[in-house]
């Protein structure tokens, strides 16, 4: 999804949950030539870290595509806070994960019950493209092959 963001000129904000203790985001992600904004946090919800919330607001978007690690904790709390702030939230189910599958599914079910739209990566990408005549159709298609 991050590479698709680069291709489609979609802003990307990456958070790292306590990288000193849990490790940093992979260089494969950070070094994508999109220059994503990478910010550290210790809160579970992105919106509870002022610097990250300000970075999200600065993008001027009302639709947020969300994915990440610990679906049932960080992703869930972020999604719920985004909804409260008036954002339209789309979770990429197959780009998110929890250590336990049961927690992942419970987090997804809870988000869905709160109005978060649950998509797969492929569904999201083709909804963004709308048509095979989109100028970046081939590039996006190659990402999912």
Model-assigned labels for residue ranges:
Residues 11-17:
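Short beta-strand segments at enzyme active-site cores
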Residues 4-8, 20-145:
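Active-site-adjacent betaalpha module
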């Amino acid at each position: 999804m991050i590479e698709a963001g680069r291709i489609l000129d979609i802003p990307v904000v990456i958070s790292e949950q306590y990288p000193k203790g849990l490790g940093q985001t992979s260089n494969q992600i950070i070094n994508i030539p999109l220059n994503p904004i990478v910010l550290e946090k210790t809160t579970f919800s992105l919106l509870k870290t002022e610097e990250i919330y300000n970075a999200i607001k600065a993008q001027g978007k009302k639709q947020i595509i969300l994915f990440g690690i610990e679906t049932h904790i960080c992703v869930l709390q972020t999604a719920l806070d985004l909804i409260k702030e008036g954002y339209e939230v789309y979770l990429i189910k197959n780009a998110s994960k929890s250590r336990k599958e049961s927690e992942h599914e419970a987090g997804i079910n809870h988000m869905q019950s709160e109005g978060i739209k649950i998509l797969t990566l492929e569904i999201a990408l083709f909804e963004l493209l709308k048509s095979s005549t989109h100028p970046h159709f081939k590039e996006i298609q190659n990402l999912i092959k």
